């Protein structure tokens, strides 16, 4: 019998079990050579979290052109503030891989980032957080350009998952998936200032424009919880589909997509009306992370249960292609891309 944490990190291990559970020292980045960002994205980078590898996909031919070994359990990724280096969080490898975001070339590692399941810079780029999903800890680093210095390691149970920030970079929010809570951290003091209960197994987080509401994907249920975080209360639930998980904004400051891992759908939400506007259906199982081309017309999606990546035509809300990749594909990235707003 798998533990819940194993199922969460690698949900395709036992899909039937997952369905049952759901329903009932300073660090310095390596110097990166400057490669101009193309006018259009050329290569999609996909993390195969159960294979310790990265698939590089030619976005024109939609074929895997290279599979590169990386550290154990690569789950999430993000750009450095100067946009020259892609950071890949190798959770079980206890390090962060450095990669050229344009061509997928490996550039080295940052060691001793312990259990980095999810990572993220604050909007002002002065703070960097690594969530230790397995070890129940949140590590907060002071960031000065490419330099990181551990400010504080906070024990935070149970199972810190995703991250969001206020636009002024004063507060970070962390979902605690196994205690079904949302935690707020004051970044100046690196202290937990409050917790509040959420629905079962919260995961993805997204802050609406103007820092008005915090959207929480309730993966153990079928909805997005809308939180008035200033008053620590629920405003409403937006019902989307079972396994409501992660967010990707369209880039128009109005709409955000949400992946529903168990329902195998993606919902389009209006952040102004707090209503669902539609669903993308007919998808392979386990839609998870998403990325959008800079013209806002095409979305790439990882399907964790199906070992595939999908390409979706946004105007028609239809799946137009799938590409086989490795086991448990999670993070996906390319540059340039639509704005995260």
Each PLM stretch: what is its role?
Residues 1-2, 152:
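Accessible peptide chain termini
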Residues 22, 26-341:
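Predominantly soluble domains enriched in secretory-pathway, periplasmic, or organellar proteins
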Residues 2-17:
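Bacterial N-terminal signal peptides that target proteins for export
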């Amino acid at each position: 019998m798998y533990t819940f944490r194993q199922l969460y990190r690698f949900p395709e291990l036992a899909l039937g079990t997952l369905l049952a559970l759901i329903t009932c020292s300073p660090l310095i980045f390596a110097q990166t050579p400057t490669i101009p960002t193309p006018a259009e994205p050329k290569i999609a980078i996909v993390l195969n979290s159960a294979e310790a590898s990265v698939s590089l996909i030619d976005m024109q031919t939609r074929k895997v052109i290279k599979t590169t070994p990386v550290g154990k359990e690569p789950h999430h990724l993000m750009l450095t503030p100067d946009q020259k280096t892609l950071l890949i969080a190798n959770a079980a490898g206890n390090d962060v891989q450095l990669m050229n975001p344009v061509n997928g070339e490996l550039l080295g590692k940052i060691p001793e980032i312990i259990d980095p399941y999810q990572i993220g810079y604050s909007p002002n780029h002065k703070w960097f957080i690594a969530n230790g999903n397995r070890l129940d800890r949140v590590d907060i680093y002071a960031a000065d350009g490419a330099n990181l210095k551990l400010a504080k390691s906070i024990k935070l149970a149970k199972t810190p998952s995703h991250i969001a920030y206020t636009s002024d970079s004063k507060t970070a929010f962390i979902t605690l998936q196994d205690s079904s809570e949302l935690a707020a951290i004051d970044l100046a003091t690196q202290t937990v200032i409050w917790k509040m209960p959420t629905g079962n197994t919260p995961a993805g987080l997204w802050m609406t424009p103007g820092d008005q509401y915090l959207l929480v994907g309730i993966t153990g249920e079928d909805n997005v919880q809308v939180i008035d975080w200033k008053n620590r209360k629920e405003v409403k639930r937006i019902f989307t589909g079972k396994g409501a998980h992660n967010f990707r904004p369209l880039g128009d400051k109005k709409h955000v997509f949400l992946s529903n891992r168990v329902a195998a759908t993606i919902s389009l939400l209006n952040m102004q009306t707090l209503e669902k506007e539609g669903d993308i259906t007919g998808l392979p199982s386990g839609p998870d992370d998403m990325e959008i081309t800079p013209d806002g017309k095409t979305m790439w999606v990882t399907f964790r249960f199906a070992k595939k990546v999908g390409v979706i035509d946004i105007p028609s809300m239809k799946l137009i292609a799938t590409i086989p990749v490795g086991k448990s594909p999670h993070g996906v990235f390319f540059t340039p891309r639509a704005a995260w707003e």
